[in-house]
């Protein structure tokens, strides 16, 4: 199941500012480099803003920033304080220990955050000047997330519980065994062997540090929050502190692996009883939030079981009558991070429309939706206190910074400029929005990035970027792996088509791809390549094609169908054999929905059409150099897919290399591995595309 926006950004955040005291590792390729072209080292040591919190009076912001050391191959994190007008920036922690997930507590008198104590993640609090640290939790095994009740009397936290271990439970005398006895599905998920489940706990704050809380799912093996990417944003405490709502898919094994049907549950703290608030709603229900007066609850809801990319709708529950209202009916865009206004009359949220993510306001009285912000950018998170809203913003040209938003005018004022000096060293990269006609008579938005000092009288090598997901928009994102800017910085024109099958262009466009993997979306890629080759500045013999995940599948497929359009390929974590992927991947609901069914369902026309488009069936047509990258801890698309593709290319006589990581998952997270990724990526492109 995909998780979006700031929770994921924080999960993989690795960097803090180079001007933070004591964090230079002496590497001359860090941000202090005077290079006029972005290097992998510059990209990977840029400051990365993680979680942030606006004070109750709206005047101050606390936020976390991290910076990896390439030499040490690990990251340090630090908390900073800044006024909401951008003044008074100062460090609150010294970076010697992890400091993440900051929140203002006690009406702004203190700041809570997570840090590592004796090898375990625990909650601490400090004064706003960074002094008087107090340990709030001392939970055995540590915690993973937290929320304070509005009255400050209760703490809700998340922590992992151990699941039964068949091998160890049956053989208690064998204390050094490593084998696993597996009896059902979901034994692996994302990048881990499933040995624990996240649970939600509640405890009184009267006695600190807290050493034990009440498990809301005591005796159950279910997840709350749900793996692999959900967090405490799927939990809400009522304003009166009498109950807790949480999202959970109360299934295990095979049943879990084929269903996306989660629900919102309400735990009554007085009676200890649990009620399903979304009984009969069959899709993915998440992100509960109570109105300021506690009379209503909103949540995000998908309609259909098994469809992880269904439209994310906003619903309202009247807690007195039980009536449910579909607030965003007719709005064909995903609702992210819905947040109540202080007066309870409006709900603010983020939505991606035509490949730009912006802030919106929904007025409850008439259900009218107003777009607040404008521009070629993505807003990826926000915090609201009263009428003050602070948001995290990024684009293909600049990483995340914090901005104060005027809710009436929609204007943005920068609060942070974490990478200002680095960006000032770089050339002027231009990002252009184009609309192209597709072969089925529709319009497709394509982003095009041009190198610095672009001269239309010259010829440039180019890269066609294939998106993953598959139902994931190429918006104005900033990435530390697939970064369009660094590609343009290295002299390439970068072509990024929002082909059929991505959200942000209406429901029909998004859903078209399911059961049509080798169809219209592939024709869209060829359209983008052909249209760009009409430009005189595109080198017709210097176009590469790259992509990860479903984008990697696209690369493998195009390698057998491109008819000499491309001069090299790069596939990261791609699907090579669809039949093998159906059985290897862990989230079977995705395979069932997108592929149409199982390969043994011979009378299932959709499934059989899908499997007939598997890239491994077209290796006989491969004739173009291909680089293959994969992580062996990738349990979404197993490394065997990359190994098969490499072996096939080598045996077929196609120039090929494989970059294989034994300790990376679907992403590449370790600093030195990330540098190796970028260096290998550009070495391959330069070898085949630059004359």
UniProtKB/Swiss-Prot annotation:
pH dependence: Optimum pH is 6.7, using Lys-Ala-MCA as substrate.
Active-site residues (renumbered): 549 (charge relay system), 634 (charge relay system), 666 (charge relay system)
Xref: InterPro entries: 6-blade_b-propeller_TolB-like, AB_hydrolase_fold, Peptidase_S9_cat, Peptidase_S9B_N
Gene Ontology molecular function terms on file: aminopeptidase activity; dipeptidyl-peptidase activity; peptide binding; serine-type endopeptidase activity
Domain of life: Bacteria
A GO term from the CC aspect: periplasmic space
Compartments, record wording: Periplasm
Name of the top EC class for this enzyme: hydrolase
SUPFAM superfamilies (UniProt xref): alpha/beta-Hydrolases, DPP6 N-terminal domain-like
Record key words, sorted: Aminopeptidase, Hydrolase, Periplasm, Protease, Serine protease, Signal
GO BP terms in the entry: peptide catabolic process; proteolysis
The protein's Enzyme Commission number: 3.4.14.-
Signal sequence bounds: 1-20
Assembly and oligomerization: Homodimer.
Sequence similarity: Belongs to the peptidase S9C family.
General function of this protein: Catalyzes the removal of dipeptides from the N-terminus of oligopeptides. Prefers Ala and hydrophobic residues at the P1 position, and has no preference for P2 residues. Shows the highest dipeptidyl peptidase activity toward the synthetic substrate Lys-Ala-methylcoumaryl-7-amide (Lys-Ala-MCA). Is likely involved in amino acid metabolism and bacterial growth/survival of asaccharolytic P.endodontalis, that utilizes amino acids from extracellular proteinaceous nutrients as energy and carbon sources.
Record protein name field: Dipeptidyl-peptidase 5
Organism for this UniProt entry: Porphyromonas endodontalis (strain ATCC 35406 / DSM 24491 / JCM 8526 / CCUG 16442 / BCRC 14492 / NCTC 13058 / HG 370) (Bacteroides endodontalis)
């Amino acid at each position: 199941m995909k998780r979006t926006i700031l929770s994921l950004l924080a999960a993989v955040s690795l960097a803090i500012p180079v001007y933070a005291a004591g964090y230079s590792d002496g590497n001359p390729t860090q941000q202090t480099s005077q290079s006029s072209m972005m290097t992998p080292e510059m990209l990977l040591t840029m400051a990365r803003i993680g979680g942030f919190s606006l004070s109750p009076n709206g005047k101050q912001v606390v936020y976390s920033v991290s910076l990896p050391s390439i030499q040490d191959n690990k990251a340090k994190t630090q908390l900073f304080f800044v006024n909401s007008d951008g003044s008074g920036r100062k460090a609150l922690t010294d970076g010697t220990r992890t400091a993440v997930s900051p929140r203002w507590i006690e009406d702004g008198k203190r700041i809570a955050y997570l840090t590592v104590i004796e090898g375990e993640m625990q909650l601490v609090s400090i004064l706003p000047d960074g002094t008087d640290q107090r340990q709030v939790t001392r939970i055995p095994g540590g915690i993973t997330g937290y929320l304070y009740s509005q009255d400050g009397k209760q703490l809700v936290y998340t922590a992992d519980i151990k699941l039964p271990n068949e091998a160890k439970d049956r053989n208690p005398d064998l204390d050094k065994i490593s084998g696993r006895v597996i009896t059902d599905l979901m034994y692996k998920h994302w990048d881990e062997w499933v040995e624990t489940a996240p649970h939600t706990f509640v405890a009184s704050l009267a006695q600190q540090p807290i050493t034990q809380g009440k498990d809301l799912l005591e005796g159950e093996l279910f997840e709350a929050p749900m793996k692999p990417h959900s967090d405490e944003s799927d939990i809400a405490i009522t304003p009166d502190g009498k109950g807790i709502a949480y999202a959970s898919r109360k299934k295990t094994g095979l049943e879990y692996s084929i269903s996306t049907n989660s629900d919102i549950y309400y735990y009554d703290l007085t009676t200890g009883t649990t009620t399903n608030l979304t009984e009969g709603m069959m899709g993915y229900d998440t992100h509960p939030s109570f109105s300021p007066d506690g009379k209503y609850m909103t949540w995000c809801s998908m309609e259909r079981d098994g469809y992880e990319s269904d439209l994310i709708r906003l619903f309202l529950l009247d807690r007195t009558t039980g009536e449910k209202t579909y607030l965003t009916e007719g709005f064909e865009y995903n609702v992210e991070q819905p947040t109540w206004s202080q007066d309870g009359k409006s709900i603010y949220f983020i939505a991606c429309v035509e490949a730009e993510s912006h802030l919106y306001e929904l007025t409850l009285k008439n259900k009218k939706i107003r777009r607040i912000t404008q521009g070629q950018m993505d807003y990826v998170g926000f915090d609201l206190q009263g009428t003050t809203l602070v948001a995290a913003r990024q684009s293909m040209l600049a990483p995340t910074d914090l901005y104060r938003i005027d809710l009436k005018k929609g204007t943005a004022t920068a609060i942070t400029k974490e990478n200002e000096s680095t960006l000032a060293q770089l050339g002027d990269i231009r990002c252009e929005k184009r609309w192209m006609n597709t072969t089925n008579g529709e319009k497709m938005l394509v982003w095009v990035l041009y190198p610095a000092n672009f001269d239309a009288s010259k010829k440039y090598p180019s890269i066609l970027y294939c998106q993953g997901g598959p139902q994931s928009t190429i918006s104005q994102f900033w990435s530390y792996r697939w970064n369009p800017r660094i590609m343009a910085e290295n002299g390439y024109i970068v072509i990024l088509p929002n082909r059929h099958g991505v959200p942000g262009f209406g429901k029909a466009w998004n859903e078209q791809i399911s059961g049509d993997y080798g169809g219209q979306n592939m024709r869209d890629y060829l359209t983008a390549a052909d249209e760009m080759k009409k430009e005189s500045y595109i080198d017709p013999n210097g176009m590469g094609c790259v992509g990860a995940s479903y984008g990697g599948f696209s690369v493998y497929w195009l390698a057998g169908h491109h008819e000499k359009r491309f001069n090299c390929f790069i596939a990261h974590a791609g699907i090579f054999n669809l039949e093998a992927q159906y059985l290897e991947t862990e989230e079977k609901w995705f395979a069932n929905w997108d592929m149409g069914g199982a390969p043994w369902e011979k009378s299932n026309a959709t499934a059989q059409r899908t499997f007939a488009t598997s890239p491994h069936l077209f290796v006989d047509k491969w004739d173009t150099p291909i680089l293959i990258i994969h992580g062996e801890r990738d349990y979404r698309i197993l490394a065997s897919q990359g190994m098969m593709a490499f072996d096939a290319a080598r045996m077929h006589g196609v120039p090929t290399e494989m970059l294989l990581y034994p300790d990376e998952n679907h992403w590449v997270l370790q600093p030195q591995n990330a540098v190796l990724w970028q260096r290998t990526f550009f070495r391959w492109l330069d070898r085949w595309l630059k004359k």
